[in-house]
Design a protein with these regions (language model features):
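Short His-Asn-centered micro-motif
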Residues: 24-27, 47, 208-209
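Glycine-rich phosphate-binding loop and adjoining helix at the ATP-binding site
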Residues: 1-35, 41-43, 63-80, 219-221
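Structural beta-strand/beta-sheet cores of well-ordered domains, especially the beta-sheet scaffolds
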Residues: 41-45, 49-51, 67, 203
Length: 238
């Protein structure tokens, strides 16, 4: 249906000589684009406002040709959420859905940060924070934490000491680290699935998105998690 609608729209624009062959999402596009330069790319992932991952599956039954599997991994639900995760989920537009995405993505990390901070500071209402705010806090440094102090003053009306700001930065980092490790765990699961009973093959993971590209410490924590989970096999993955 989508292909037909796209084809009709192209014709209306006078572009009748283009025939759409396939409709793909951004996750699959990341894998395919990376595979042009890195033929051993097996996993494509979006780590941004939302989260999803796909992978190239070769071991399909009945002689079916290799196929890219879109996992919709943001909807994974066999997790161990904490009470802040549950509070965020219950207040969301679709409670019970996209549980992993609500624990890892840029859309929700700032909200989680605000929920925890409200309890930590004993605030009467949850302050509004975004992942951009978290990035600013993570970029801020000792000894003064000036940007963090200014941001917290704006959002909460409270003037914090440098020690308080250091604790707030630690909270932001903890939320980011958990996000990166959960996302990386999904990659490790795919890698182990593809390896089966054999050794982990040399392969490339293509990751795109605002959290991975722009949030401080995101890339470093994904890489660290790969080594923590895969051990020596992580040397086969880049």
């Amino acid at each position: 249906v989508v292909k037909d609608l796209l084809e009709a729209a192209l014709v209306r624009q006078g572009i009748g000589n283009v025939e759409p062959a396939a409709i793909i999402n951004d996750t699959v596009a990341v894998l395919l684009a990376a595979a042009y330069k890195q033929p051993d790319t097996r996993i494509g992932s979006i780590y941004a406002t939302g989260h999803n991952t796909c992978y190239l599956e070769s071991a399909l039954p009945g002689g079916i040709a290799p196929m890219v599997i879109n996992m919709e991994s943001g909807s994974f639900s066999k997790l161990l959420p904490n009470r802040f995760d549950n509070e965020l989920d219950e207040a969301s537009e679709k409670p019970g859905e996209q549980r992993l995405e609500k624990m890892v993505s840029g859309r929700y990390m700032g909200e989680l940060f605000g929920l925890v901070l409200a309890e930590l500071m004993e605030l009467s209402a949850k302050p509004a924070f975004t992942s951009i705010d978290m990035s600013a806090i993570l970029e801020d440094g000792a000894p003064e934490y000036r940007k963090t102090a200014e941001l917290l003053q704006q959002r909460t009306g409270t003037q914090l000491s440098a020690g308080d700001c250091a604790m707030v930065r630690g909270l932001a980092e903890a939320i980011l680290v958990r996000s990166a490790r959960l996302v990386t765990a999904t990659y490790a699961g795919i890698i182990w699935h593809l390896a089966g009973a054999g050794n982990v093959a040399r392969q490339h993971i293509a990751i795109d998105g605002s959290v991975y590209e722009k949030m401080p410490l995101a890339k470093e924590n994904v890489l660290k998690a790969l080594y923590d989970i895969l051990g020596e096999d992580a040397a086969q993955v880049d």
